[in-house]
Curated annotation (Swiss-Prot):
'Asrij' stands for 'blood' in Sanskrit as this protein is strongly expressed in blood vessels. Isoform 1 is highly expressed in many tissues, including testis, brain, placenta, ovary, prostate and mammary gland. Isoform 2 expression is restricted to the central nervous system including brain, cerebellum and spinal cord. Maintains stem cell potency. Increases STAT3 phosphorylation and controls ERK phosphorylation. May act as a scaffold, increasing STAT3 recruitment onto endosomes. Involved in integrin-mediated cancer cell adhesion and colony formation in ovarian cancer. This is OCIA domain-containing protein 1. It is found in: Endosome. The lineage of its organism: Eukaryota, Metazoa, Chordata, Craniata, Vertebrata. Interacts with OCIAD2. Interacts with STAT3. Residues 1-112 form the OCIA domain. InterPro entries: OCAD1/2 (IPR040187), OCIA_dom (IPR009764).
Length: 245
């Protein structure tokens, strides 16, 4: 037993490899014959009719005055341009028919490439992507059948998770400490609370202070010392000097 398991989808179609058709590809005799046949048929059956039709339409537009003619060469430049456009349009319109002829060739690498490309385009979207994804996943999973590394992994002991300790006395994992919820600070509770003063108390206090100030103004015994001391009479000479008698 080689340790590999081969899983394959039953009745799976293996897509044929697309032949490489590069610039250095040399066509076969049948392919050359089909090339010449396509060239002749596209010229006589498509290019010539379209070129003639384009020239007739262009000449009619010029004669009706819809298209202006050249002052020196007349309608010749526009007719040549219409002929060239009709020629290439005929060649391009015959490409599909020429491809069908190559697909009918049995021993033709070019025909095989065209058939493979058509099969890929006609398949449902994601078909080849899903198949390649399935193959890659199967090949990646098939290596675990008899791998010794897988056996060693299974023999390793399984450790149960350590329960988290809810107290400081029990053993706890390294680096993990219990979170102790602290209560409110007692100093904050002991701080005196500010007494709320009502409006009535504040009003009475202001009234008392007003009455005290009013009595001080009316009572002469409470007047200031400098108001109660009588002023001495002094004499003043003509020079403004004063003296006491």
């Amino acid at each position: 037993m080689n340790g590999r398991a081969d899983f394959r989808e039953p009745n799976a179609e293996v897509p044929r490899p697309i032949p490489h058709i590069g610039p250095d590809y040399i066509p076969t005799e049948e392919e050359r014959r089909v090339f010449a046949e396509c060239n002749d048929e596209s010229f006589w059956f498509r290019s010539v009719p379209l070129a003639a039709t384009s020239m007739l339409i262009t000449q009619g537009l010029i004669s009706k005055g819809i298209l202006s003619s050249h002052p020196k060469y007349g309608s010749i430049p526009k007719l040549i341009l219409a002929c060239i456009m009709g020629y290439f349009a005929g060649k391009l319109s015959y490409v599909k028919t020429c491809q069908e002829k190559f697909k009918k060739l049995e021993n033709s690498p070019l025909g095989e490439a065209l058939r493979s490309g058509q099969a890929r385009r006609s398949s449902p979207p994601g078909h080849y992507y899903q198949k390649s994804k399935y193959d890659s996943s199967v090949s990646g999973q098939s290596s675990f059948v008899t791998s010794p590394a897988a056996d060693n992994i299974e023999m390793l002991p399984h450790y149960e998770p350590i329960p988290f300790s809810s107290s400081m006395n029990e053993s706890a994992p390294t680096g993990i400490t219990d979170h102790i919820v602290q209560g409110p600070d007692p100093n904050l509770e002991e701080s005196p609370k500010r007494k709320n003063i009502t409006y009535e108390e504040l009003r009475n206090k202001n009234r008392e202070s007003y009455e005290v100030s009013l009595t001080q103004k009316t009572d002469p015994s409470v007047r200031p010392m400098h108001e109660r001391v009588p002023k001495k009479e002094v004499k003043v000479n003509k020079y403004g000097d004063t003296w006491d008698e």
